[in-house]
Amino acid sequence: MAIAQSDSEDSELEEGETDLIYDARIDNLCSFLESEIHPLYSLVRSLKKGVAFHHGGLLDVARLEVEDLFVDGAIRNLVCTSTLLQGVNLPADRMIVISPKIGDYELSHFDFLNLIGRAGRINTSLYGEIFCIQLVDEEWAEDKIESNETKEIQSSVLRKLNEYSESVVSYIDVYTEDIIDAQGDLKAVTLASYLRSQFLVDREHYDKIISNSNLTSNQIRVMTNRLEALEDVLKVPKDIVYKNPFIDPLLIDQLYFLVESEGVNKWMIDKYPRVRSGVADPNVEFQFMNYYNQYKSIVTRLDDIFGIEKEINYKEDGVSRKSSYYVSIFKLVNDSHKWMQGRNYRFFIDDMVTKKLTSKGISVDYKKIDGITNFVTTHINTNLTFILVKYLSLWADVVSSFMTEEERTLNAFFLNLSSMLEMGSYDPQVLEVMAYGINRSTAIELLKKQKMKSEQTTWQYLMQYNLDRLSPLHRKYLQRAGFGSSKPA
């Protein structure tokens, strides 16, 4: 779909004239994207033509800047996905809807009305214009606009439970691996795992889900009996399951058993990432390894239990691929380590361009850069800072449960690996700056351009920061957070 702002009066351009609006913020955003993403990134090229695009996979800074520029009228035309339906407040004077679908799914009447409700601005326009583009033999607009369809609100959990009720009941106490071996219905596996978790840590919520479902009384009885029996044999403390409700309790229990039987020392990293210590050989005993190999050992053993690589690469059916680019567990380890070292998106994009294109003699153009960029942003925002973070957080919960309070304090750095990965840095100073509401790329740039003095607190460093050292975009985000000084520090 596309949305646009209109001039107060229609006018025809003279030959050689342009209606492009010059705004230094557009140049600043283009410079940032060329540095952080790639000079051939399509958003750079389109911004220079007065058009932007907007979708959930955009870099956070780029998405926020595009929204600001559109709202302020510096960008008049915006091509976007269904992010408009997901809380992004971008009203427009004119909207063009080119398809009644979100991806492969038909846009519901409710969502369509929500979408077209973005046309018009409460402060400046009493109405907006909506254009629905339809092809011959594919008429849809009139039906959408005139439909009296009502929407019944139902949680996705209930909808899936009613759809896969028999499978969920059968799988409620069965390991995923056994279901796969039996060629069972993988679409019911995640829901069965979630219901196991809710039964163990929030029985009231579990009962509410079940009572509102279409399960028969016999199915409910069978599920309850199996879950009660399961509860009796699990060793993992309930508070660990409670903290990790979207990970299968059966597998959490398996991890807990391994840590308990093998000893915490076999599961606890004790080398620091920015210190040369330990052996680089990955085949030595765990306690002799350097940091990177200890980290790799932990993640690969977590993968053996939880199937992280499969979760990243395959859809819920266990067969369809999420992306044409496959992410091995070793790539996940290496990329997450590089991300915590402070590498930016451009580093990962350039690495893929080299490996997938230039080394194979394939020409580099904007379409290929866009495809790689979309993969890298999804890889970082989903695979690294969501999926892997989820399992590293669980790992920390499990190993710390065997420690004394003093041992937890001594190992605090390693137990916070999930937070470091989510925020994207091993560097305590970067993390401290980010804690003041500064985005990652700006925080890294600040410390690169001006070191923090030993006698300074983080707050003093930010307040006294010399704004002249920064590019306009980074300067803007520092000032927006209430920091920075025009005088040299």
PLM region spans:
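Conserved C-terminal RecA-like helicase domain
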Residues: 1-77, 92, 103-110
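Ser/Thr-glycine-rich phosphate-binding loops at phosphate-binding pockets of nucleotides
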Residues: 78-84
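Short, ordered loop/turn segments at secondary-structure junctions
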Residues: 83, 100-101
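N-terminal nucleotide-binding beta1-loop-alpha1 segment
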Residues: 87
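Conserved segment of the helicase C-terminal RecA-like domain
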Residues: 90, 94, 101-151
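C-terminal helicase module of SF1/SF2 nucleic-acid helicases/translocases
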Residues: 126-225
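C-terminal accessory/interaction regions of large nucleic acid-associated machines
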Residues: 175-202, 212, 231-489
